[in-house]
Structure formats: structure tokens, C-alpha cells
């Protein structure tokens, strides 16, 4: 007997005339907006020009979405390339299906090329964006709730998630795009919620550790990767959705273990301390210093590097 449950949304798609409004896409967009806002504040706090963040996002977001989709299609190819499958579905990104590692790799490469073009160091930006990325991932996981996907085995725990029988306008079974009939097909472990909560925990840890230990030179990003993969490793083993297996083990479990080990090694190999504003962006630091000297009221303006943690270059 299930004492209590978490209901799923009755549907994940609404229509404004002929235009579909998909909750999955809205959650991703919300995560991106929050990530850009937070990264601007954090990058400015390190001495960087916050305007660079939006420019970086313009190249990172589309590259990340493409990379995430490619990774998903490759690692879950059985969903798109089988006797009864339609390969065209591989392009239907609004139906869900983005692999975080593909997004990080291709999005990261796009940002790396952008920063190389700008002749700026990548590490300070990577450290600034890391907590924002994990927070955006948590927000994006809400899209899985609307899509009724990425859940675990059946259970009767008080926080079990109800999976509804959804149908389209023709009465055909449509678990992602349909509307609930009210029939509960199963109560399952809400693994999307477990990952959402884990992501929020890692976000808080990164913000605290960055401020407490003055992390820099890419160490915040390495800590993000290690923290996320640690949680993904055990959550992945709870999921029951179809997945590619290697030696009977889900491929994302293997990837998480390998990447976790690599991130830990990199974290301890990277240089300690944090970059000065002059190291983050010499040109912007010089312009801020010049503005401070030229302040009409005689009061110095905030220096590059004074931001969300209240630091000054002298305290780094």
C-alpha cells in the first residue's frame, strides 16, 4: 500500500493555436536564463567583463544542445535505429533526450574557441560558470517530470511518483505528448527528483567552497564535474528506462565513474589559489582602474574582482 505519492503533471505540452508550448523546452530555457544571470555576477566578481558571458552563451547554448542530442542518440541508439523505429525521431529534440556530457563537451569546446579568439584565459570563466551549470541542470530536470521520463523501479515509498496513462487526441498512447486519463499506471522512484536535489546540493557546495577556499585555475569546474558524476553514478543505477549496456552495466554509469576519477585527479593537479583580475582580463581590469581614477565625485568605483563574495584583489 502506498501511503502518499507525488503526482505527475497531467500533460507536458500545451497549445497556443497551432503552436506547441513544451514544458521540457521551457525548463531548459529557464535554466539557461538563470545560468547566464549567475555567471555574469560570478565572472564579474573574478575581474572579468560580464558582457563576455552573453557572447559566450550565444555560442555555447546551441553547441551544447547539439552536443547533448548527439550524445543521447549515440548512447540510446536503440530508440531511433531499429526495425520499428523512425530515425527521423532522432531530430525531435522537443520530445526530450539530451545527454549532459555531450552538452558539456561540445558546449565547452565552443566556449574554448571563443575565449581563444578573445585571447582570454578559459579557467576563470569555467570556474564562474560551474555552479550556474549545475543549477541549470537541476532546473532542467523538472522537464523530465513533465515528460514522465527517467524514473526508477516501482515502489511504495511515501515520495513515489505517479505515472499516468496519457493519450493523444485520437486516444492513442502518448506518454510524452499526450494528456492524462487519470489512470495511474505505476508508482515509481522519482530519480529525476533525486538528481535535481543532488544538483542543488552540489550547487551549494560549490558556492561555499569557492568562497571559503578561494578556488581558481579551473578547480571549481573540476569539483563540479566530480560532484555531479558522484551523484549520477548511484542515481543511474536506480533507473529502469532502456539504456545501452556495456558488460551488463549502463553506459552512463561507466562514464560517470571514469569522469569522476579524472576530475578528482585534475582537481589536485591544478594550481591552488585564484587568478587576479589582471590575469582574468587585463584590458577590462585596466579600464575599471581608469574609471575609478576618473570618477567625477571623487569616490573610487568598484574595482574589477569586487563582487558577490565581497573580495578585493588584496584579499585573494
Curated annotation (Swiss-Prot):
Membrane topology type: Multi-pass membrane protein
Subcellular location: Cell membrane
GO function terms (MF aspect): phosphatidylglycerol-prolipoprotein diacylglyceryl transferase activity
InterPro entries named among the record's database cross-references: Lgt (IPR001640)
Stretches the record annotates as Disordered: 292-316
TM spans (from-to): 18-38, 47-67, 95-115, 188-208, 251-271
Annotated EC: 2.5.1.145
PANTHER family reported in the protein's UniProt record: PHOSPHATIDYLGLYCEROL--PROLIPOPROTEIN DIACYLGLYCERYL TRANSFERASE, PROLIPOPROTEIN DIACYLGLYCERYL TRANSFERASE
Function: Catalyzes the transfer of the diacylglyceryl group from phosphatidylglycerol to the sulfhydryl group of the N-terminal cysteine of a prolipoprotein, the first step in the formation of mature lipoproteins.
Name of the protein in its database record: Phosphatidylglycerol--prolipoprotein diacylglyceryl transferase
Gene: lgt
Amino acid at each position: 500500500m502506498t501511503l502518499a505519492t507525488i503526482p505527475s503533471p497531467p500533460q507536458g505540452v500545451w497549445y497556443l493555436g497551432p503552436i506547441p508550448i513544451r514544458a521540457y523546452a521551457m525548463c531548459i530555457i529557464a535554466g539557461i536564463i538563470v545560468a547566464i544571470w549567475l555567471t555574469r555576477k560570478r565572472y564579474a566578481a573574478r575581474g572579468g567583463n560580464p558582457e563576455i558571458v552573453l557572447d559566450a552563451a550565444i555560442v555555447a547554448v546551441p553547441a551544447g544542445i547539439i552536443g547533448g542530442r548527439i550524445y543521447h542518440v549515440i548512447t540510446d541508439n536503440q530508440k531511433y535505429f531499429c526495425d520499428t523505429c523512425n530515425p527521423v525521431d532522432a531530430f525531435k529534440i522537443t520530445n526530450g533526450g539530451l545527454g549532459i556530457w555531450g552538452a558539456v563537451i561540445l558546449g565547452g569546446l565552443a566556449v574554448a574557441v571563443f575565449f581563444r579568439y578573445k585571447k582570454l584565459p578559459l579557467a576563470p570563466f569555467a570556474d564562474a560558470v560551474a555552479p550556474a551549470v549545475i543549477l541549470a541542470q537541476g532546473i532542467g530536470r523538472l522537464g523530465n517530470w513533465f515528460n514522465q521520463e527517467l524514473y526508477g523501479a516501482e515502489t511504495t515509498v511515501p515520495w513515489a511518483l505517479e505515472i499516468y496513462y496519457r493519450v493523444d487526441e485520437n486516444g492513442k498512447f502518448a506518454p510524452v505528448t499526450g494528456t492524462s486519463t487519470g489512470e495511474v499506471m505505476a508508482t515509481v522512484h522519482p530519480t529525476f527528483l533525486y538528481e535535481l536535489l543532488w544538483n542543488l546540493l552540489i550547487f551549494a557546495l560549490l558556492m561555499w567552497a569557492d568562497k571559503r577556499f578561494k578556488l581558481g585555475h579551473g578547480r571549481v569546474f573540476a569539483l563540479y564535474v566530480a560532484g555531479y558524476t558522484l551523484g549520477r553514478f548511484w542515481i543511474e543505477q536506480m533507473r529502469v528506462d532502456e539504456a545501452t549496456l556495456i558488460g551488463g552495466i549502463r553506459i552512463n554509469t561507466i562514464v560517470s565513474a571514469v569522469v569522476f576519477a579524472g576530475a578528482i585527479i585534475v582537481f589536485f593537479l591544478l594550481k591552488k589559489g585564484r587568478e587576479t583580475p589582471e590575469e582574468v582580463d587585463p584590458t577590462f581590469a585596466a579600464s575599471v582602474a581608469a574609471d575609478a581614477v576618473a570618477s567625477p565625485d571623487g569616490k573610487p568605483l568598484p574595482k574589477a574582482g569586487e563582487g558577490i563574495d565581497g573580495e578585493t584583489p588584496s584579499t585573494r
